[in-house]
Every structure is written in C-alpha cells, then in structure tokens.
Amino acid sequence: MQDTAIQEIQGAETLEALQAVKTKYVGKSGLVTKELGSLGKLPPEERKACGAEINVVRAAIQAALDEKESALKRAALDAKLASEAIDVTLPGLPLPAGGLHPISRVLDDLIGIYRQMGYAVIEGPEVEEEHYNFEALNVPWYHPARDLQDTFWLEDGRLLRTHTSPMQIRYMVDHEPPFKIVVRGKVYRYEATDATHEAMFHQLEGLVVGDGISMSDLKGTIAEMARGLYGASAKARFQPSYYPFVEPGADFAVYWENPRGESKWLELGGCGMVHPNVFKAVDDLREAAGKDRVYEGKTGFAFGLGLERIAMLKYGIPDIRYFYANDPRVIGQFRGELG
C-alpha cells in the first residue's frame, strides 16, 4: 500500500489531485485509517506489532503528501510570478504634473515681498464677533455693511468676517507697538455672484504702528509692493477715498504693462492712516482686559487688497468664478508658469 500511495502522490499534478490521494489513504474513511480501525479485531498479541507497522506506513505517506504539497505550491507561485512579471528596466507611467493655484501663487509672491520688508504674517478667525468686525473699526451702525443683506450673520449673533481688518484689533489688543504685520485669509460678502464678484474671496491686509508713522511711509510701502509684484518699472498712485477705519483714506492703483504689451493703471485696493477712534477702541479693550493703554499718540497705516483681482489682471482671467469651478481645463493652463 505504501509504494502504491507514494506513486499516486508523485503522479499528482495539481493540489486538487493531491487532495484526492490524501483523502483516499489518510482521510477519515481512507485505506490507512480503516486499517488502524480494524486493529481491534486482531488478537491482543498481534495488535502492537501491526499497529506500529501501519503507523510507519501512515507516516511515510503523510511525509510524501507534505513534500508534494510544498512542491506544487512552489510551482504555482513560480507560474503566477512569471505571468505577472514586471520589467523594472521599463520607464514608469508619468504622473501628472501639479501646479500652484493662481491665488496661491499671488499670495506667495505678496507674502515674500512683505517678509523682505520685515512684516510678520498672521491669520485670524473667519467667524468673527460683531464688535471686532464693526464697532472697534469705527464702522457706525448705519453703515451699509451692517445691513442683513450685505453680511452673513450667524444665529448666535456672530458673523462671517467681511474683511481681514478685525485682526488689526485682535493683534493690537495683544501686542504693543511698534510692529509691522500682514494678515491673509478668506472674507465673505452676502452679494450676488457674477464675473467680478464672489460671496467668498481672499484678502491681504497690512498694518504698521509706531511713532511718527506717516502717509509717506504708506506710499513708499505700496510703491515697493508694486515693484516687487510687477517689476522695477511699476508705479503707484493714490486717490482720496473714504474708509471708516482710516483717516485720511485712499485707493491705490499700479501702472503696469501686462504680458500683451498693454500699459494701464490697475486699481488694487484701499489704504490710509489708522483712524484715532480705532486706537481708542483698542485701548478700551486693553483696559478692560487689565492691560495698559499704549496706543494714545501712536500713528500707523493700513492697507488691503483682493487677491482674486490681482490674479485676474496678472493672468488674464476674465471671470472670478473660474478660480473655484474646479475645472482642470482652466487651472491646468497655469501649470507651466505656476508649477
């Protein structure tokens, strides 16, 4: 039986065939198992010798089964590896090249310019308290921005900030002058969306406070930003304008030649000298928090600009909605320049 079983084991070409041989000989109803079960019918003096002989046969068959099973599994694995072989010398599949979003690139450029001028970069909460967004910035109750139709109000009385200026107040409450900061972040306006307006957009705002800060310092800062952003030939101009948190206030524009060779003035943002009422509001908040009043007699300037507008002008994007449409056909056009 042993020789026959081993021949059948060696002749099995698949794991299924080997399992059939195993069942035939050492399964629950196998030939060897039956022989062991019949030992009880033998005379007592013969059982021990016959049992030992059958166990030797069973062990030999099991050893042959194990060896054959290992060989068949190795062969199956080798065949699978051969069928799935990868030529590691072939070039890999190219990954699509990424690129910076136009807004990110403009922001990085501006941050780099202001860091070179010694500005610290900070961020603030997008969900803001009404006092920080309006009252502390000298925005009166009758200002249009405080209307329900122009601001996203939350049920608890807070709001989505309409500008990054609240961080001026928060920073001054926690810090004493002199300092130079720029604030970056998203702002929200409750208005209809069209080619030039979005309910959410990005701002970069600057604040400088110290002794003897003047309008000339502000103009020099804006001019330096213009040259850093648009080249050494860029020029800046200022026109009087009203903003409740600065006095005097101005709009600023940059004279720039675009990639198509067209030169014109581009309005970029607003600026001005920090209003004395803003400094007073900050000192009031500091006093309420147990801090010294340190802003009386100080001067400073602030400025703010929209990043989407700069990117639209710089890259010739006609519609602000393209920035957030997640359309790879649009953003992919800037991969070479922005990547």
Curated annotation (Swiss-Prot):
UniProt cofactor(s): Mg(2+)
Annotated source species: Deinococcus radiodurans (strain ATCC 13939 / DSM 20539 / JCM 16871 / CCUG 27074 / LMG 4051 / NBRC 15346 / NCIMB 9279 / VKM B-1422 / R1)
Top-rank taxon: Bacteria
Name of the protein in its database record: Phenylalanine--tRNA ligase alpha subunit
CDD domains associated with the record: PheRS_alpha_core
Transferase listed as a keyword: no
Similarity comment: family membership: Belongs to the class-II aminoacyl-tRNA synthetase family. Phe-tRNA synthetase alpha subunit type 1 subfamily.
Top-level EC class: ligase
Pfam families: Phe_tRNA-synt_N, tRNA-synt_2d
Catalytic activity annotation: tRNA(Phe) + L-phenylalanine + ATP = L-phenylalanyl-tRNA(Phe) + AMP + diphosphate + H(+)
An example molecular function term from Gene Ontology annotations: tRNA binding
GO cellular component terms, A-Z: cytoplasm
Binding-site residues for Mg(2+), renumbered to this chain: E247
Keyword terms of this UniProt record: Aminoacyl-tRNA synthetase, ATP-binding, Cytoplasm, Ligase, Magnesium, Metal-binding, Nucleotide-binding, Protein biosynthesis
Cofactor: how and how many bound: Binds 2 magnesium ions per tetramer.
GO BP terms in the entry: phenylalanyl-tRNA aminoacylation
Subunit structure: Tetramer of two alpha and two beta subunits.
